[in-house]
Amino acid sequence: MGGFPEATGNLLDAAAQEFHPTVCAPYPLQPLPQQLYCPHPYPAMPVPPPPQIAMLQPVPPMAMAMAPQPGYTLPTTTPVVNGPSSRVVVLGLVPPHAQEADVAQAMAPFGAIRSVDACAVASEGVATVHFFDIRAAELALTCVREQHMRQQSRLGQLYAAAAVAPAWAPAPTPQAWDWPHPNDDGRGLVLGHAVWAHFATGADDGDNRGSLVVLSPLPGVSVADLRQVFQAFGDLKDVRESAQRPSHKFVDFFDTRDAARALAELNGQELFGRRLVVEFTRPSGPGPRRRGYAPHQHRPTAPTPPRLQATWRPSQPTSSQPPASSSSSGSVRAREGVVLLRRSSCKSSAGSDQSSKGGNAGTSHERKTKGGKIVVAAAAASSSTPTASGKQTQKGVGSSGGGSWKGRKSGWEARFLFKEPEAGGGADTQATPASEMDTRTTVMIRNIPNKYSQKLLLNMLDNHCIQSNEWIVASGEEQPFSAYDFVYLPIDFNNKCNVGYGFVNLTSPEARVRLYKAFHKQPWEVYNSRKICQVTYARVQGLEALKEHFKNSKFPCDSDEYLPVAFSPARDGKELTDPVPIVGRSPAASSASSPPKSRAASVDRLGQELMPAPSSSADGASSTTTSTHAPSEHDEEEEEGDIRLAGELRRLGYDD
């Protein structure tokens, strides 16, 4: 055969025996440790394990295990956890099929649970548990870590002997097996699985973190006397004086429910010859809450995570300013629990509000248009128009010159704009005699999310009126209450969405000013909208003029929710007057002969005639078609629709 002359026969002998190496490796291959499933009660172990070997300190769950060494014993308790304690415990390595009820059932033996957030269990194996008592959270973390370390010890016992003992060494003498632990009752396991836990530092965000501060000076009252008063409401963690202000006393409760009960019972009560002023301790670190903090706004005593937070409305404001005008008063909420408007910071509002000033008057005149005769509110000349908040750059249609139409100008004549409030003052009514106050009451609310319904708009106005009227009662000022008697939210009947603006008639100029201060330049928080609410005067003013404007009009729709409505008596949130349509509606079938878009355009024109005239200083627009469909949720498309709308209004002659 070629290549090996001395070889005879076939080298690949089929009858040859299988080759076996004669030299073995000194250490066998070590299999990777696996997560054990430990149902409760624990099953009996059939085979005794190798000698007990444990690690010195607990190891986080995803860390690589070090080679165990013999001669060490397992600590009986988990070492003290470094870092501050919290009432929020984050669980890791949670079984992906676990539900919120399973996590709550596993953590319930440690103490009362405020809420459980298990939305990240399926994707990340993480669940968040909020306890009322910080002692319950500490106990839960200790037990969960003990269970995890006990399982790591068992894994070490299973695989350590193979890693340290040679193959020729004699078998070790069986020792006692700690399965199950004599004091183990299954606590700390989630569906029989050992998990890991750590505190969520900074996640216990809210007014009530179990800490109160007594602001009223109490001369001659010691910390021991104060402890005796507050400990009647629950166990105290600490009572101390402020290092910066010794007159302020801090009282820390273990349980947030005890702190809320103490605040409700003692705040404003006569004690030690003084009226107690008690508040929740503000956050000590920097952040938006630190910058925009306002004392004691009566928020929920036990705030839940954002996904689980319920609707809440204060029963009585205590601030010296209207809740809607306070930078930290929170957002206006609808009755169904929808967050409507998000308050912006004081600095940003003040910076944008001081950009300009405007003037207005209260006269009116009539004007002929293609749609008939309408009443137009006239005003004196004004100085300048404010810069609208929003994007500074965008794509424009029919724009002339650099910059954007919405970013540089407000787009409306100055006589339809509110006089911006100066620093520390109000709008329109600040230092203005009653005889010179603008008497207009009808406003236009712009940049409404297109999915907003008339019902949500009424809920928003009801909440605003309730808060404003409660502030008037609490402050003792003699002002007309906030109420409204007309609402119109134009709807595109093709897709059942609003067209981005609406009209409201208030019952007094003071109510109009309060609505402006509450809503103008505030972002919405519904439907993931990034629109900025804007409030201007409407072209047609007064309830009677609005009724005359819609006289003999019929809307081709099948629901009264799409019609302009009036309220008699006026609606103020507590007096929930039913809306009464001021126009008729024709069945959709009777108007089938006309194109849908033309019908929508005719109805939309009635709403456009209520709008203020666009400013002549705004960029020109060459568009000759009106967009009657609801704008897209994308900001650029919405802004392009506003540009086309302004151009169409100028084309129709509304440019004086």
UniProtKB/Swiss-Prot annotation:
Phenotype when the gene is knocked out: Plants almost double the number of leaves, and plant height are reduced to about the half that of the wild-type. Internode number is increased and their elongation is significantly reduced. The terminal tassel (terminal male inflorescence) is replaced by an ear-like (female-like) inflorescence.
The organism of origin for this protein: Zea mays
An annotated Gene Ontology molecular function: RNA binding
This protein's record includes keyword RNA-binding: yes
InterPro entries for the chain: EAR1-like_RRM3 (IPR034458), Mei2-like_Rrm_C (IPR007201), Nucleotide-bd_a/b_plait_sf (IPR012677), RBD_domain_sf (IPR035979), RRM_dom (IPR000504)
Name by which UniProt lists this protein: Protein terminal ear1
Compositional bias per record (Basic residues), positions renumbered to this chain: 288-299
Function: Probable RNA-binding protein. Involved in the regulation of leaf initiation rate and shoot development. Seems to act more predominantly in the early stages of the leaf development, rather than in the later phase.
Any single GO CC term annotated in Swiss-Prot or TrEMBL for this entry: nuclear speck
Keyword set, alphabetical order: Developmental protein, Repeat, RNA-binding
